[in-house]
Regions:
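Glycine-rich oxoanion-binding loops at beta->alpha junctions
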Residues: 15-67, 76-77, 104, 114-124, ...
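Short gly/pro/ser/thr-enriched loop/turn and capping motifs at secondary-structure boundaries
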Residues: 11-14, 77-78, 103-108, 176-179
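Charged helix-capping and loop-helix junction motifs
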Residues: 55, 185-190, 279-284
Length: 286
């Protein structure tokens, strides 16, 4: 049979002369397959072209007679795996590569009706929180503004909002490639608040995908007063700011301007839904 070598710290280990590894046998795998998170410690490291020529640990592959590279992750992980396979082929050491599309964002190009690994579990756990928030809104007569992870896609926010019958869901895809502005987002939520009031309902909840932030122009970000730092891949580090608090503050300001007395509260659906125990769908996925 095959020997399975687990590599800690993601791609960092392949560009390190002394990678941290663990041999994974069947009894070990049987004890971790139904757990949340990752047994192998992860890393956000994405190698530059110069890293391949200067730091790539080809000896690790040849010494261990590695024939198959299995990667688990999103688009950055997949593209790097492809670069590694091509690099090794150029070095006369071709390998096979299998990529497991794992991301709660559900933003990889898979066959229709096939979500990414982990998405359904994150959606399920997010919906548990969102349902409780909606009950609180009805009980207290308040509004809640939720922000959900999703980087550049709105699938998670939409899935959670749809499951909980939220009166307003804001995702980047709904703007149909027109310019996304803070004013548009705020006005969508305000319109839902007004509509509910006309219906005799003084409470509600809106969920906004963090993906809308990626679509905001630099000018819009400056006008809003939002300050982002960026990771090594050039992505805004959205996890370092509370999107729910930002939007809630803007919505409260607009409500005050138009004379509507509505209390709203922010709720961030973030890292706490990433490493939840997988539901049955994901347990049978892979």
């Amino acid at each position: 049979g095959y020997r399975v070598i687990g590599l800690h710290e993601g791609y960092t280990g392949l560009f390190n002369p002394s990678p941290r590894t663990v041999d994974i046998d069947y009894p070990m795998a049987d004890g971790i397959f139904n757990q949340g998170g990752s047994f192998l410690q992860m890393s956000r490291f994405k190698p530059k072209d110069s890293d391949f020529e200067n730091n790539f640990n080809l000896k690790f592959f040849t010494d261990n007679n590695i024939k198959l590279l299995v990667t688990v992750g999103g688009d950055d992980t997949a593209s790097t795996a492809n670069r590694i396979a091509k690099f090794l082929e150029a070095k006369k050491y071709p390998i096979a590569n299998i990529h497991v599309p794992k991301t709660i964002d559900n933003d990889l190009p898979l066959p229709k009706g096939t979500p990414t690994f982990g998405y359904e579990s994150a959606k399920d756990k997010g919906a548990v929180i969102a349902r409780a928030v909606y009950v609180d809104a009805r009980t207290s007569g308040n509004w809640f503004v939720l922000a959900a992870m999703g980087r550049s896609a709105g699938h998670l926010a939409f899935g959670i909002g749809e499951a909980c019958h939220y009166p307003m869901i804001v995702i980047p895809e709904m703007f149909d490639k027109t310019e996304i502005t803070v004013e548009k987002i705020v006005n969508l939520v305000i319109s839902s608040i007004i509509k509910r009031k006309i219906m005799g309902m003084d409470y509600g909840a809106a969920v906004i995908s963090e993906g809308v932030f990626h679509a905001l122009s630099d000018e819009e970000i400056r006008k809003s007063g939002i300050h982002f730092t960026y990771d090594e891949h050039g992505h805004p580090e959205l996890g370092k700011v509370s999107k729910a608090h930002i939007f809630n503050e803007m919505i409260e300001k607009k409500l005050k301007e138009i004379g509507l007395k509505v209390k709203s509260r922010p709720v961030e659906l973030g890292y706490e839904i990433r490493c939840q125990t997988p539901i049955a769908y994901d347990l049978t996925y892979c």
